[in-house]
């Protein structure tokens, strides 16, 4: 609540630390009506910056609170140095770059935008999709939906094959009825979490691509079809520092204080 936020800002400043308040929603019209009124008490608490993504809200905040520093959120999906220059001209003080960039792309942005503060995620979950940027078409067909070449992979038919892990770690399909209806469905029970984990593996196969399998793992909690591996860039921190990245970001939203502290 607002009291906790004010206390947190005062606590951080008393210990010589900065605190940035995330306000990175992409609002519908209805939320614009009260946005500035709702944000005024937050701004008056004196955070060191607002993390924002929507161009309209950024414009409104800069008009109403011209002295409030603004950092561009990762949710603005900044992918290239031209976009960074655009936001720099708009008065943004720091850009949190898209998590989908390679190290070489980050280095090029740093080279092209030497005067802009850059922040990079080095740990946390990765989103599966953004409107017009679904990963399926790019993963299966190497055709990027955002480049106008989406193959609508989400609408294709997929069969599920049970698999086992070989001695060398390879996944081997199990000879059995491969229709999706034949796969045992996970049903939660009152003893969920008790007993040995199932550790099952299923391979998804698109009907026009026989023999091309995509793994989906199941344990005692369920099946994780949409669960990407977390970003873990600790091995690249030294290079990021050398190229001049100003800040490294660890995902904290929906995570415990313990998780964030131990990761840091």
How would you name each of these model-derived features?
Residues 1-78, 96-97, 104-247, 254-264:
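Active-site pocket-lining/capping segments in soluble small-molecule metabolic enzymes
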């Amino acid at each position: 609540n607002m009291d906790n936020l004010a206390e947190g800002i005062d606590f951080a400043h008393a210990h010589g630390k900065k605190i940035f308040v995330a306000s990175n929603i992409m609002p519908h019209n209805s939320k614009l009506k009260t946005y500035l009124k709702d944000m005024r008490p937050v701004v008056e608490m004196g955070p060191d910056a607002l993390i924002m993504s929507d161009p309209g809200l950024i414009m409104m905040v800069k008009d109403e609170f011209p002295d409030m520093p603004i950092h561009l959120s990762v949710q603005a999906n900044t992918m290239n140095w031209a976009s960074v220059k655009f936001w720099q001209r708009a008065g943004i003080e720091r850009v949190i770059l898209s998590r989908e960039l390679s190290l070489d792309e980050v280095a090029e942005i740093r080279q092209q935008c030497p005067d802009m503060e850059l922040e990079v995620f080095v740990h946390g979950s990765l989103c599966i999709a953004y409107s017009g940027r679904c990963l399926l078409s790019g993963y299966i067909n190497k055709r990027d939906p955002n480049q106008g070449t989406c193959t609508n992979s989400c609408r294709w038919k997929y069969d599920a094959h049970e698999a086992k892990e070989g001695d060398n770690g390879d996944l081997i399909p199990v000879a059995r009825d491969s229709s999706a209806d034949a796969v045992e469905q996970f049903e939660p029970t009152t003893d969920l979490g008790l007993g040995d984990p199932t550790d099952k593996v299923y391979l998804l196969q698109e009907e026009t691509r026989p023999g091309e399998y995509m793994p989906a793992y199941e344990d005692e909690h369920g099946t994780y079809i949409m669960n990407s591996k977390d970003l873990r860039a600790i091995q690249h921190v030294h290079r990021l520092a050398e190229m001049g990245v100003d800040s490294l970001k660890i995902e904290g939203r929906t995570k415990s204080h313990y998780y964030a502290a131990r990761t840091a």
